[in-house]
């Protein structure tokens, strides 16, 4: 083709689509963001009819052209793509326009291909499928011919285009018929009428697919006609006609421009590239262009092949990770995929024998359903979790007005209805035939979730009752045990039954019948009530046996003894006059205290019948029973039960401790009598008054003493009145502290001086004598 810097071969002679088309677009537009602001134009016509020459003159492209002086032969092979932003107009030969991509299609009816019309048909169909404007280039003398003006080819192209793209009713293509070498003898209007009549006749004879029976040519195409003078004989007029044609392409005024919004595919360049490639692949693999009507013997093979292609298309477009939280989104996507697949199948397979076509269609639908079930199951798993979480949330919300069993029934029905509605949406849209397995699985999961929440609610109710019973025991029964009477256990059991009854009152249905409102049967409710009473008796057992230990029993006896010993029947403190009175009170108080020892040691009613729980008790640790026989470390068996509180040895030790403390109390009482009987006699005070009267009168009669006494009294009064004791005491303390510090320092100085004198004395030199000198002096003296 010569220089091809500004054009690439979009489809080569081997019918292969150029994979570097997108890079070519990027090279053309560079860094500009073109978006959808571009147009695509194709030219179609007989070989050597001047198509490339027209494009070069009109759009300033550089497509190779034929040198007629040398030889008339095929110049354009395949489909070539060029780019321009300049167009020839009457005003300017280089008028700037939007990006135009021009397709130069290999000419039809060429000697090189002979009777092989497969490529020219596919090329024409491809040009119609991807272009906004298709220029049909023909000579004036070809008008009225059937083969010469490509009407037979246009019929085939129209038919296949209608079957493949008939559903795109919102898209049109402009067919611009350019009549070349128009000498003006036959008016353009006459040529236009002839061509329109031929096109309408072709359209009416088409085998239209379902849904397009009543469609017309103008539903899919707009028709425009123009004429160009002879390029060689009338070159100036030819260029003028070309520029007039350029005005229509460059104009942006509605009604005058060749471009309309409905012509555009509304795809960015990269999207258009993909679209063009897909269109060519679809056209290239559409074997119906070259095959006659299929026989019934091959119908099954063809429909199966088309079915596999349709399923492959679905799998190709199926998202790898399809996660939709909304039902409408998922259903819409799946419905779109199914429609795409079945439409692909129906488009091609419906042309074959209907029974075979329908059988394979049902098989294809079943395969689609199996694929959809995988995605729907994942979606339903997410919805199950959400619904079960909502059930749990509804059941955990506190509501005093609505019983739990009512909430559970309502929540279960709400969740089950919501899930069934989800399933109904999928089946109603015919995405799947049935989802009974998923429905059954959700019902089981829902029952399990409700059962779990029921157990939790029951556990909370039992714990709440146990806490209420435990609180009542600690408050009410503690007081009874701390202040025991002979009918202690009658009162304890009465209070205990009252506490249990109050705690379970809201669940009582009838006498000895209870409903814990979690959906249990009558028998199960009775078992729960038995468990509640067992917990209550266990709490009472642990509290009684924990409180009435040996030390606490001694304290209770001591308190009971002291209340009787120290206070009279009017709760007034006793004033002892003699030891006999103390001894009598001691005897009575001791008997009063010890009379409840048996009561505190053994739990029995006023009829002396041991108290036995009406349900078995357990400690909660491996169901260890709190009652019955047990073996101690020495291998001796003992009876363990609710009524047995203190053993005989514990009672004996408690009595000994109590007597020891009671004796101490008596001794203190007797000592108080001794202190009151050894006080100073009254006559001593009388003697002090008589003998000291004179001294008292001396003080009273001395004015100095009286004045000093008055001053001190007045001073003390005002100090007290003004609340000055604190400052005075602080001042006195400060003065005393300073005095002490000063005296301490003086004493330290004196001691330091004495120490220094002693040191100096010890350091004075002393006269030393040798033993020989002493001997000499001794001898001298003797002589």
Swiss-Prot record:
Q: Name one GO cellular component term.
A: endoplasmic reticulum membrane
Q: Name the InterPro entries for this protein.
A: G_GB1_RHD3_dom, P-loop_NTPase, RHD3/Sey1, Sey1/RHD3-like_3HB
Q: How does it sit in the membrane?
A: Multi-pass membrane protein
Q: Which Pfam families match?
A: RHD3_GTPase (PF05879), Sey1_3HB (PF20428)
List the transmembrane segments: 680-700, 704-724
- Specify whether NADP is a keyword of the entry: no
The GB1/RHD3-type G domain is annotated at: 35-265
> Where is the protein found, in the record's own terms?
Endoplasmic reticulum membrane
Q: Top-level EC class, please? A: hydrolase
Record flagged with keyword Iron-sulfur: no
Instruction: Supply the alphabetized keyword list.
Output: Endoplasmic reticulum, GTP-binding, Hydrolase, Membrane, Nucleotide-binding, Transmembrane, Transmembrane helix
Q: Which SUPFAM superfamilies did the record assign? A: P-loop containing nucleoside triphosphate hydrolases
Which residues does the annotated region (Disordered) include? 752-783
Q: Which residues lie on this side of the membrane: Cytoplasmic?
A: 1-679, 725-783
As for family, the record states: Belongs to the TRAFAC class dynamin-like GTPase superfamily. GB1/RHD3 GTPase family. RHD3 subfamily.
Q: What is this protein called?
A: Protein SEY1
Q: Report which gene this protein is encoded by.
A: SEY1
